[in-house]
Amino acid sequence: LNLPFYETGKVKKGGIGEEDVKITMDLIEKVKPHQIYLAGDLADPHGTHKVCLEIIFEAVRRLKKKKYMDDCYVWMYRGAWHEWPIHEIHMAVPLSPNEVMRKRMAIFKHQSQKDVPVFPGNDSREFWQRAKERNEETAEMYNKLGLPEYEAMEAFRRWNFQAGEVL
């Protein structure tokens, strides 16, 4: 989406505006999704994921009384920095070696996530390396709990907006 908050021409992005929320609401109204996936990584030092998260949260809050939203689940995944604590994971999706490679190629399609991160924090690894290792560590946690061994796992936390959950 070409949201207005992002188009400042500067590293520091603008704040959330009504137009950002309206564009997002219009897309949700058009698609009437059963599932929405979003980056729930509030540790993102660049802050873009947090702004997008707040825009989507506000759009969903305003639309939650629509009938089609009764069947909509909002799933948050973590970015390159941290994983959800295992007790907060509501859905874990096993990834095969081919799916891990496909995810890496998808990361490469994002200009801001190629090569060395612009805002690496204390971690100089590339995004794909961080994501790969995070997904492998998640799979290892589940294996230690006695579940089948997988190459990697993507973990999601559900935002239960229908019940008024506050995050």
Region spans (language model):
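Short, isolated positions within intrinsically disordered regulatory regions of eukaryotic proteins
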Residues: 79, 85, 132, 160-165
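Generic structural hydrophobic/aromatic packing signal, biased to beta-strands
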Residues: 56, 74-77, 93, 156
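A conserved mid-domain beta-alpha-beta active-site/ligand-binding segment of alpha/beta enzyme cores
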Residues: 83-141
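Short, flexible loop segments at boundaries between secondary-structure elements
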Residues: 61-89
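Active-site donor-binding loop signature of nucleotide-sugar glycosyltransferases
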Residues: 3, 79, 95-97
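Intrinsically disordered, low-complexity sequence elements enriched in Ser/Thr/Gly/Pro
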Residues: 76, 101, 132, 155-156
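Active-site beta-strand->loop->alpha-helix modules in alpha/beta enzyme cores, enriched
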Residues: 1-70, 105-111, 124-129, 137, ...
